[in-house]
Amino acid sequence: MNQQLNNLTLPIYMDYQATTPLDPRVMEAMLPYFTTKFGNPHSRSHSFGWEAERAVEEARSRVARLIGADTKEIIFTSGATESNNLAIKGVAKFYGNKKNHIITVVSEHKCVLDACRYLEQEGINITYLPVKPNGIIALETLKNAITDQTMLVSVMAVNNEIGVVQPLKEIGKICRARGVFFHSDIAQGFGKIPIDVNEFNIDLASISGHKIYGPKGIGGLYVRKKPRVRVTPLINGGGQERGMRSGTLPTPLIVGLGVAAEIAYSEMEKDTKHVNYLFDRFLNNIHSRISEVYLNGAKDPRYKGNLNLSFAGVEGESIILAIKDLAVSSGSACTSASLEPSYVLRSMGIGEELAHTSIRFGIGRFTTEQEIDYAVNLICSKIDKLRKLSPLWEMMQEGIDLKKIKWAVH
């Protein structure tokens, strides 16, 4: 239930990595395609179909422009999970009789890791690269992992849990030099940081509508045409989307994604400035008021709409309950129902005692300075109270090493 407090609507939304609110301009553009402009974009014999097809193609070109791609290289899907599966499994199925090795990273999104585990059962060899304590891969490790059997390297642009930005340009250069396809899950970076598929030598890129103030249920896969990348489709049917993704296209959702991409293209600089300012305000004010708060992942390069913080001596779950006026999560939305510490934080070498205390705060286009100040005040007062009640915090103050404590499974 929403409630009002000093012109603030509570709870305050700070979970922008899980999803973003629909931009009102996106909503406005979509509405006619639910009502009067309802044609099937594949109907070639009348104006309803032509009108829908025109709208779809305009959206496709807007999405392409945001990442420097050719319009024909964008395939519409239901979202980034499907795009990741299509890219990874599609390449493996098409090229699997020639090569049998894929490289990814231990801290990738769960859908990438699960697609790779599925392929392992099919006989494909997968290398999971480690990350440094700052969450970023070592390029030397990637170079050493590539063999003449490697067909694909999959590394995300911006991590969904900790916001660090991987060195895509350097990874792309390495892959191109070795004749290996480079796939990137850019869902958390699309429209938020500059990404150019040609400059970065990206061959496949997965995007999502609802991470950029667009609708849920729509995403895309960029598939390079030159040099050509082939993927075996996951879905068979009418052969839409260059034969890679059959099914009637959802025109209203595609229009929404296109407008969201257009807004991101023209307002990225403004959004970045806004988010960076609020990130600094939030982090500096927290650090000035409470001790033993750690930012997980590199501060730079990072998408600053993501603050993953560990509050030493307090359980993450109890923090979430205490700050229920803030909509936040511990870990990614896909796995936050689990009480296990985040596998992303563990992959960075963060111990259980700190991994258990982490909260992800998201800042976005519609976050206000007033909301940030309210959040800081609430967090500081609640952490203070929780620490007074916390035996862990007491033990830390007494100099007991929490790393030596045996944690019971929940």
From Swiss-Prot:
Residues the record marks as active site: C334 (cysteine persulfide intermediate)
Ranges in coiled-coil conformation: none
EC number: 2.8.1.7
Any one GO molecular-function label of the UniProt entry: pyridoxal phosphate binding
Signal peptide: none
Keywords: 2Fe-2S, Cytoplasm, Iron, Iron-sulfur, Metal-binding, Pyridoxal phosphate, Transferase
One of the GO BP terms on file: [2Fe-2S] cluster assembly
InterPro entries cross-referenced by the UniProt entry: Aminotrans_V_dom, Aminotrans_V_PyrdxlP_BS, Cys_deSase_IscS, Cysteine_dSase, PyrdxlP-dep_Trfase, PyrdxlP-dep_Trfase_major, PyrdxlP-dep_Trfase_small
Cofactor(s) this protein requires: pyridoxal 5'-phosphate
Domain of life: Bacteria
Cellular component aspect of the GO annotation: L-cysteine desulfurase complex
Pathway given in the UniProt record: Cofactor biosynthesis; iron-sulfur cluster biosynthesis
Catalyzed reactions: (sulfur carrier)-H + L-cysteine = (sulfur carrier)-SH + L-alanine
Ligand binding (pyridoxal 5'-phosphate): A80, T81, N160, Q188, S208, G209, H210, T248
Transmembrane segments: none
Localization in the cell: Cytoplasm
NCBIfam families: IscS, PRK02948.1, PRK14012.1
PANTHER family per the UniProt record, alphabetical: CYSTEINE DESULFURASE, CYSTEINE DESULFURYLASE FAMILY MEMBER
Function as written in the Swiss-Prot or TrEMBL entry: Master enzyme that delivers sulfur to a number of partners involved in Fe-S cluster assembly, tRNA modification or cofactor biosynthesis. Catalyzes the removal of elemental sulfur atoms from cysteine to produce alanine. Functions as a sulfur delivery protein for Fe-S cluster synthesis onto IscU, an Fe-S scaffold assembly protein, as well as other S acceptor proteins.
Family note: Belongs to the class-V pyridoxal-phosphate-dependent aminotransferase family. NifS/IscS subfamily.
Quaternary context: Homodimer. Forms a heterotetramer with IscU, interacts with other sulfur acceptors.
Name of the protein described by the UniProt record: Cysteine desulfurase IscS
The species this protein was found in: Rickettsia akari (strain Hartford)
